[in-house]
Amino acid sequence: MNDEASTPIQEDLKEESAVDLAQEAKPTSDEPSLSNVAEGSQEAGAETDVTSSDAKDSSSQALDNEARLEQLEREHETLNSQYMRIAADFDNFRKRQSRDQDDLRLQLQCNTLSSILPVVDNFDRARQQLNPEGEEAQALHKSYQGLYKQLVDVLKQLGVAPMRVVGQTFDPSLHEAVLREPSDELAEDIIVEELQRGYHLNGRVLRHALVKVSMGPGPKDDGEETITEQSLEGDNTTDQQSSEKSD
């Protein structure tokens, strides 16, 4: 009877012991399991790999950016050099174009004025030759002189100025020698006479002056040399006779 009564109690004790043993065998939440440790190690390794990969990517990106920057700087220097060269060429072209336009304008002006100068020459010759007599002729001559003066004033306003050449030394850049003659009064290459007036246009030669130039003193004639020699011989003979008489 005692054996049958104790059997349920023993079974309960056995069950409680089994439960306790199971609880003791079960790991607590505070103690990490081997699997958790392994998983953590794997995650840490993965994070380390990611960090290392990011660092490599950042370093590679920095090198690429630096290389790209150097390339852009070289391209900038090349383009800037090309721009400066093009700007200099354009400035030279602009200056050359302006100079060519000025030269063309001056050439057209010279051609126009050169065609007017013969008219001025005719006015000047007529003014010097006319000697009017009577009131009507003098009135006509006065009107003619006024017209000539008006023409000269217009030329002066355009920058035309006459040359003054008589008594000056001959200069082939200004004068054109048409005649040459000996002169006892003037040295060689001195302008004796103006045959056609020359003109300047704003400091440049518009038309050369046609002139007569001195050749300087000419050679002595043979007759004059003979007379001079004879007179010298006569003087010497007279001196000798005078000295003999005195002796």
Curated annotation (Swiss-Prot):
SUPFAM superfamilies: Coiled-coil domain of nucleotide exchange factor GrpE, Head domain of nucleotide exchange factor GrpE
The keyword Flavoprotein belongs to this UniProt entry's keyword annotation: no
InterPro entries linked to this entry: GrpE, GrpE_coiled_coil, GrpE_head
GO molecular function, one term: protein-folding chaperone binding
GO annotation, biological process: protein folding
GO cellular component, one term: cytoplasm
Region feature (Disordered): 1-64, 214-247
Record localization: Cytoplasm
UniProt keyword annotations, A-Z: Chaperone, Cytoplasm, Stress response
Protein family: Belongs to the GrpE family.
Protein known as: Protein GrpE
Species for this entry: Prochlorococcus marinus (strain MIT 9211)
